[in-house]
Amino acid sequence: MAYEFDHVHLKSVDPGASADWYVRAFNFKIISDSVRLWGDRFVRCETPDGAIVNISGARTDEMMGDADAGAHWGLEHFGLKV
């Protein structure tokens, strides 16, 4: 089955600060920065070679764990196109 990488989605306590760090450390470009309907800040970044990295915060009233099976900080998911 053919597939290609689409994006990575990270969850952060401070999506803006995290995105700024990636800009400084790895020359990412911030494509958009908005608050979604669910109340979470969503920052879309692009690497110098075109990979997309999305960074978002907790949704309204969402309880975030450190690394459990529920919603948690860090890697939320990575997306593949099939």
Model-derived segments and spans:
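Vicinal oxygen chelate
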Residues: E4-V13, R41-E46, D66-V82
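Generic preference for hydrophobic
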Residues: I55-G57
